Amino acid sequence: MKVTSYSRILIILAALVGALVVPLKAQDSQQDYVNAHNQARSQIGVGPMQWDEGLAAYARNYANQLKGDCRLVHSRGPYGENLAKSGGDLSGVAAVNLWVNEKANYNYDTNTCNGVCGHYTQVVWRNSVRLGCAKVRCNNGGTIISCNYDPPGNYANQKPY
């Protein structure tokens, strides 16, 4: 069978697209979300979280409701919740890292924040042991990441760990 120049170009393009798709999905798996959370938790001696498909379905359903305008509005549901967005693509691991970076704003001794730190405290909340997350592409090309936690955290006057 003779391969034409056009066929070679199509084969090369298919290989390139395949090579690009794999990295885009590389930090959005269930295990990627769990690992990113558990890495932050292990740094302070808090036990690991486990993936919960029911929480993931809740996160996916709610994130799909936000994709019209990509605005971050909390669901006010029964779970703890962290939301992140980007004007372009955002990986799940990058979203978790945004939340974990709020650790710099948290003072454990006084249990206070100097700026925003509630996303971080939810990630490391000792009693939150189940996790479910979703990534949704917004109509404007942006991305929303939603993670839900059970039991929820961030109770007033309680330390996360």
From Swiss-Prot:
GO CC annotations on file: extracellular region
Signal sequence annotation: 1-26
Induction info: Accumulates in root tissue in response to ethylene (ET, ACC) and methyl jasmonate (MeJA). Stimulated by the salicylic acid analog 2,6-dichloro-isonicotinic acid (INA). Expressed after wounding. Repressed in response to salicylic acid treatment. Strongly induced in response to the incompatible bacterial pathogen Pseudomonas syringae pv. tomato DC3000 (avrRpt2) but only weakly by the compatible strain P.syringae DC3000. First down-regulated early during diamond back moth (Plutella xylostella) larvae (DBM) feeding before being up-regulated after 24 hours.
SUPFAM superfamilies assigned: PR-1-like
Tissue: Expressed in flowers, stems and roots but not in leaves.
Gene: PRB1
Entry's family note: Belongs to the CRISP family.
Protein's name according to its UniProt entry: Pathogenesis-related protein 1
Role: Probably involved in the defense reaction of plants against pathogens.
Pfam families per the UniProt record, alphabetical: CAP
Cysteines engaged in disulfide bonds, as pairs: 70-138, 113-117, 133-147
Domain SCP: 34-149
Keyword field contains Transferase: no
Keyword presence, Signal: yes
Gene Ontology biological process terms, A to Z: defense response to other organism; response to bacterium; response to ethylene; response to herbivore; response to jasmonic acid; response to salicylic acid; response to wounding
Swiss-Prot/TrEMBL keywords: Disulfide bond, Plant defense, Signal
Species: Arabidopsis thaliana (Mouse-ear cress)
InterPro entries xrefs: Allrgn_V5/Tpx1_CS (IPR018244), CAP_dom (IPR014044), CAP_sf (IPR035940), CRISP-related (IPR001283)
